[in-house]
Design a protein with these regions (language model features):
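Surface-exposed coil/turn segments at beta-strand junctions on protein surfaces, enriched
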Residues: 17-19, 62, 125-129, 143-145, ...
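Residues on the solvent-exposed faces and adjacent turns
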Residues: 30, 138, 156, 168, ...
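Edge beta-strands of extracellular beta-sandwich domains
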Residues: 35-44, 161-169
């Protein structure tokens, strides 16, 4: 901008998501004035944070497989942990802590594979927030008729945390006999057959 005489300058900036403040210098050049005049503009940092993109809950298919959970942070390091859940039996059809997951040793932080709990290469969060993702593999299929749950917690270097519930849909009801035909002796002695089922049943 340019002008003449007295003026008021309005300073604005883009949203800053980095963990450290940033600065710039404004230089004024005026006719007949030497040296040039400057002032510094300081933009405050965003407090250290971490969040999951899906909020407080995400889901995995009843068939199992792979689940990737994403989020954002500006921390120097992130530490993930699976929480121990105890099923109190109060919610019918749900088994708290019944979903078996294996915590990966590494996750993706801003495109770089990073060891859980270790400093992130290049510290991208100093200048801007970054996207992270953690992928769970080989999740078993749900062979029960109950919803299964697990919980993942992530912590920043500064102690900020986020937690997300992971729910696996109930499996399909199943019922079958181990043998399609059994043979009783003439004496009528007992012969067994096995029922393989995950749901309530009756015989007639």
């Amino acid at each position: 901008m340019s002008g003449q005489g007295n003026a008021t300058i309005t300073n604005t900036g883009e949203v800053h998501t980095g963990r450290e403040q940033r600065t710039t210098t404004v230089t004024g050049v005026a006719t007949g004035v030497s040296p040039n005049k400057t002032y510094q503009v300081v933009q405050k940092a965003k407090p250290e944070f971490v969040s999951f993109d899906d909020g407080a809950e995400t889901s995995v298919a009843k068939t199992g497989g792979t689940l990737t959970i994403t989020g954002k942070s500006n921390s120097t390091a992130l530490t993930f942990e699976l929480l121990d859940l105890t099923d109190d039996g109060e919610t019918s059809g749900v088994v708290e802590g019944g979903l078996t997951l294996t915590l990966p040793e590494k996750y993706d932080a801003g495109g770089a594979q990073t060891t859980n709990g270790q400093p992130i290469t290049g510290d991208p969060g100093a200048s801007a927030e970054f996207t992270f993702s953690i992928t769970f593999t080989n999740i078993p299929a749900n062979t029960t008729i109950n919803e299964l749950t697990a919980a993942l917690k992530v912590s920043t270097t500064g102690g900020q945390t986020a937690q997300i519930s992971i729910k696996q849909s109930a499996g399909d009801p199943s019922f079958e006999f181990s043998e399609g035909t059994i043979t009783l002796e003439a004496s009528g002695a007992a012969v067994t057959n096995q029922i393989i089922s995950n749901t309530a049943w009756t015989l007639s």
